[in-house]
């Protein structure tokens, strides 16, 4: 699919209570960081997907080194390596807030996460069982760290977020996937030191 031109502004989501605006982030020192990436959403769902990716409800405040380096690397790996190698890959992602997290200096309505998580889950095939891989990445990263440095268990993501993942799976599969770190199945070492696009 052709690449769609990137919009100049993010749009307020009328469905949200706080109605966060593009300008709430102006001069805050934080990027408007995508949770679901524009590249993947526009590639899979065209203009409608891109429009959804530029809603402010898909945005979290991210430090530049986090957003433009480490997170960009991980997003690129998921679309250019995980998806082609493992077929359909489910991605669960979001912010993690600390006990004493701050708010943007430019808008009290926007809380700043201390870290972000990503969980990848493959669908099983006749030759390959379901696999899962989880990351928790602090905002303080410099950007070029090995991806494996931040691999964790899904159960640890649950402990930090208070969320319960993979609830539709049978109990044994859920327990196995959530309690295991499985780097080998994902061939993560092949892309472990992928360089950021923005250096």
What residues fall within each predicted segment?
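Glycine/proline-rich, flexible active-site/cofactor-binding loop segments
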Residues: 1-20
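Domain-level detector of nuclease and nuclease-like folds
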Residues: 14-199
């Amino acid at each position: 699919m052709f690449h769609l031109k990137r919009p100049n502004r993010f749009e307020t989501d009328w469905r949200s209570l706080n109605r966060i605006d593009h300008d709430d982030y102006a001069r805050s020192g934080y990027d408007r960081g995508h949770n679901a990436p524009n590249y993947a959403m526009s590639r899979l769902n065209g203009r409608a997907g891109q429009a959804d990716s530029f809603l402010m409800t898909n945005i979290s405040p991210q430090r530049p080194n986090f957003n433009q380096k480490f997170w960009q690397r991980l997003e690129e790996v998921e679309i250019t390596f995980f998806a082609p190698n493992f077929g359909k890959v489910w991605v669960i992602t979001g912010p993690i807030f600390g006990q004493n997290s701050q708010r943007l200096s430019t808008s009290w309505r926007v809380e700043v996460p201390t870290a972000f998580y990503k969980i990848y889950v493959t669908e099983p095939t006749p030759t390959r069982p379901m696999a899962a891989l989880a990351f928790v990445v602090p905002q303080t990263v410099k950007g070029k760290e090995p991806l494996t440095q931040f691999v964790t268990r899904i159960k640890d993501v649950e402990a930090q977020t208070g969320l319960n993942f993979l609830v539709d799976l049978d109990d044994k599969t859920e327990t196995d996937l959530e309690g295991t770190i499985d780097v080998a199945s994902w061939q993560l070492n092949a892309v472990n030191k992928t360089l950021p696009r923005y250096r």
